[in-house]
């Protein structure tokens, strides 16, 4: 059950990566969203899920990420930087295993 997750926003992820590993994520990447070049070059898009920490990124980046995710058919969730906020929004097939 290989799963890759891209987290956009926030500098310190705290327990989030550890919790994601528990539900099967083994490839976790993080872009803080401060560096515009990353966004211009494009996100690493071969991901199974994108988590946007919306309290840490600007509106423009949120929209760009959303658009790219939609084009690539990748599920995207917008959450605060807390595991409970993320967990509540995860696709059901991830939380029911």
Each language-model region and where it sits:
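Short glycine-rich, flexible loops that bind phosphorylated cofactors or substrates
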Residues: 58-60
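A short acidic, amphipathic alpha-helical/loop segment
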Residues: 18-19, 40-43, 63-65
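Alpha-helix C-terminal capping/helix-to-coil transition sites in glycosyltransferase folds
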Residues: 45-47
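Redox- and metal-dependent alpha/beta enzyme cores, enriched for Fe-S-associated oxidoreductases
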Residues: 1-24, 39
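Cofactor-binding loop segments of dinucleotide-utilizing enzymes, especially the Rossmann-like FAD-
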Residues: 8-10, 33, 81
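A short, well-structured beta->alpha microelement
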Residues: 26-43
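Ser/Thr/Gly-rich flexible loops in soluble cytosolic domains mediating phosphotransfer, phosphorylation
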Residues: 69-97
């Amino acid at each position: 059950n290989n799963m890759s997750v891209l987290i956009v926003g926030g500098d310190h992820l705290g327990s989030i990566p550890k919790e994601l590993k528990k539900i099967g994520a083994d490839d976790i990447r993080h872009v803080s969203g401060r560096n515009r070049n990353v966004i211009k070059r494009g996100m690493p898009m071969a991901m199974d899920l994108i988590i946007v920490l919306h309290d840490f990124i600007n509106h423009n980046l949120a929209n760009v990420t959303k658009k790219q995710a939609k084009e690539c058919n990748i599920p995207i969730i917008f959450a605060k930087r807390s595991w409970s906020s993320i967990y509540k929004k995860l696709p059901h097939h991830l939380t029911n295993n």
